Regions:
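Residues that mark the start of a beta-strand
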Residues: 9, 41-44
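Conserved RecA-like P-loop NTPase helicase motor core
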Residues: 44-177
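Long, largely alpha-helical accessory region at the distal end of helicase-like NTP-driven motors
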Residues: 154-230
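Short, charged low-complexity intrinsically disordered segments located at boundaries
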Residues: 18-26, 56-59, 158-162, 182
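Conserved helicase/translocase motor-coupling segment
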Residues: 1-37
């Protein structure tokens, strides 16, 4: 956050509800280690369909009152909770202008979903803090939002930049015949131990240039072609 220098507001997109719950636990443990007594397990919250009042939590995150106000600077309008961990919520139609970080901790195969998720960080915002100076006069500190960070743990950016076939013609699947009852659903795996190196230790930050990402150019081109045809 440009005003308080605490971690900016963040949305994490997880693979499943269990994954979201585990990420929330880990982040709150880290927050307590780094900032003892500052967040009291409110640093990260799980915002999924299994959590009561999840929809209201998304609204409170936008309105900067989720879990109360930030404790870093009295009078500054920002919420205490810094990270919302979700699966499918907070994508299409969700607006949070002061969002500074988006973490993709799940694979994304739909260009529309990728654009929607990435678009959560593109909203413009002015961070403001009004205070009284030594002369008891009001001053306002302002910072314009110029960038946001996209943390991609599943190479989604690479997939839509280099591997996705934008010219592929999709065919609708034919309906299946028969009256079977179907399968019994997936397997719920609660615990998983990974021995791979920490990706954060080797993560490379790449600045997106003025021409944007390929997925944006392709979608704009399709829109342009449709307008010309009409």
């Amino acid at each position: 956050d440009p005003i308080t220098n605490e971690i900016g507001k963040t949305i994490i997109f997880a693979v499943s509800q269990n994954h979201a719950r585990k990420l929330t636990e880990i982040l709150n443990e880290f927050a307590e280690q780094l900032y003892p007594g500052k967040y009291n397990s409110d640093f990260a919250v799980q915002v999924t369909s299994q959590v009561g009042d999840a929809q209201q939590m998304t609204i409170n995150f936008t309105n900067n009152n989720l879990s109360g106000k930030t404790t870093w600077l009295e009078g500054y309008k920002s919420c205490k909770t810094r990270v919302c961990v979700t699966v499918g919520m907070m994508t299409t139609g969700y607006d949070c202008p002061d969002l500074l970080n988006i973490c993709m901790m799940r694979p994304i195969f739909s260009p529309a979903d990728f654009v929607q998720i990435k678009g959560r960080g593109t909203r413009k915002n002015t961070f403001e803090y009004t205070f009284k100076n030594e002369l008891n006069e009001e001053e306002t500190q302002r910072h314009e939002k110029e960038v946001f960070k996209l943390f991609d743990f599943f190479a989604n950016c690479e997939y839509f930049e280099e591997k996705f076939d934008y010219d592929e013609k999709l065919k609708l699947p034919k309906p299946k015949k028969g009256g079977g009852e179907g399968g019994g659903g997936g397997i719920d795996i609660d615990k998983y131990t990974s021995y791979r190196p920490d990706p954060l230790a080797t993560m490379v930050e790449e600045q997106i240039g003025e021409y944007g990402m390929r997925i944006d150019r392709e979608l704009f081109k399709k829109f342009e072609d449709r307008i010309i045809m009409d």
